[in-house]
Amino acid sequence: MKIRILLCILATLLSYNVSAHDFMVDGVCYNVISEEHKLCEVTFFENESGSVKKNFYKDIVFVPETVEYGGESYYVSVIGGLAFYMQDELLSVVMPGTIRTIKNSAFISCRNIRSIVIPANVTEIESNAFQALESLTYLAVDEGNKVYDSRKGCNAIIETGSNTLLFGCRTTVIPDGVEVIARDAFWTIAPRGNETFSFDIPGSVKVIKENAFSNCEWLSSVTLHEGLEEIGLWAFNGTSIESIVIPKTVKKIEPSAFCNTKLLKSIKVKRGNKVYDSRKGCNAIVESATDCLLQACSTTTIPDGIKIVGEKAFFRIDVKSVVLPASVQEIRKSAFFGSGLQGKLVIPGNVKSIGQFAFTACSGIDELVVEEGCETIGSSAFSLCTSLRRAGLPSSLKRFGVGSVYVLVFDGCDLLENIEIPEQNPYYISNGDAIIERSTMTVVAGTGLGHCQLHIGRKDHRPRKIAKGAFWGMSYMTAVWLPETLEEIEESAFYDCPAIEFIVCGSKVPPLLGKNFGVVNAGPWHLPLQERVVLVVPEGSLDAYKSAPGWSEFRHMVER
């Protein structure tokens, strides 16, 4: 998870205006940033591929006030963007009093850096200047600095005028008087030896901004005090906190504030809070006005009266089963994403809407029953449910795969062998191997185990089109039988189906074939279907297929 996030950040950072060094003095790289004022910045060493050379800087780096270049003397005024990115052998950087600016991600992912002192004349520290510094234990600001401080030896950088804690480390003691904990302030800090740590957030803090403690994997305890008003998006995502008490002064909790907290077992909202509650000892955060369950934990029970299971409410929470009371009407986006649900999942008919990714990656679900009453199922609602074998959908279903140009409701469910929907549904039909939209006779979702037979059953139930991504990620599909009624296969319809050995076409007129309709993206078969499967076409149509766009690329083609 951390690696993926760091890669995403790096991709963003590389779009910033950072460049290789103009010159080097005593092992430190510099760029000239102003000839007129004779100013330069510390920068990174660029390797032959044009990227930052890792571990170029080692031990303690001393940056001087001035350096000589081309017979001229330059003041060192800036620590440049990515200057010390991924310098794992770096222990400390001693910065001179001439430094005015520390740029975006100047110090990021330096695993062994232990101490940083901000000089007195620094007036600007850009966002993400200090991130993922897991060994950092000493963080201070020179007492003469008029913009920033590290009051009371707190081991943090605080913007003095706004009382905003901008950057912290694992030894930070958040001092009373701080009013805001900034975005990414403690992002991915980690102790050595996997020792847990905790934070006591004083009552002066009114706002904890987004990602403030995100991915602090070994943060096991947080104490919130009365006075706190707002908790931002992903604020405590990916931490190891085991319990949380929400003060009665809290007025706003963004979705996913406590997302992906796998060890969380106890949630309580203090009585007297006017916006949120944890009614009936449910071990959850509920938005009182909307009856929306916002955040759950492994011991949550959904109480009667809850109308909405909120976005990411159970995201990666280890729950084996869930009981949805009769009051629940909506399950929102990613509500149970990656949760530990096991066995048969029954979604009662009082649930009218199931959002995108609602049960994605619930690998323990082996049977799905959506009861009569449900009307909408979002795209990827049951994607990557890798144990799912049977799915039953209701006659009340009106909208399937909502929210994406790709339907992908069951993509990656590679053991799925049967999808059923009652004949009386006016919008969709099923032949067991696929769900077909009646109005367009388009396959919107299909099964992936063994032979997929779209050519069987009533002729008026056979499809004319296969939609984008309809069979996406069906790893165990070995053969596809296409009906004589088929007119078009859209792009990526059979994307990442590596086991297909042959395709049997029923139509003498080659259907239109979309771009990348059958590319495999990983494994030994990193080839389009045209390169490796046998295409079987009706007698007398071989020449037509050999000259048709897309079909002509099949290397192995025979007539029946």
Predicted features and spans:
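Consensus positions within tandem repeat domains that build extended binding/scaffold surfaces
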Residues: 81-82, 103-106, 127-129, 184-185, ...
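Non-globular, low-complexity intrinsically disordered regions
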Residues: 41-43
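Helix-loop-beta element that forms the nucleotide-linked donor phosphate-binding surface
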Residues: 549-553
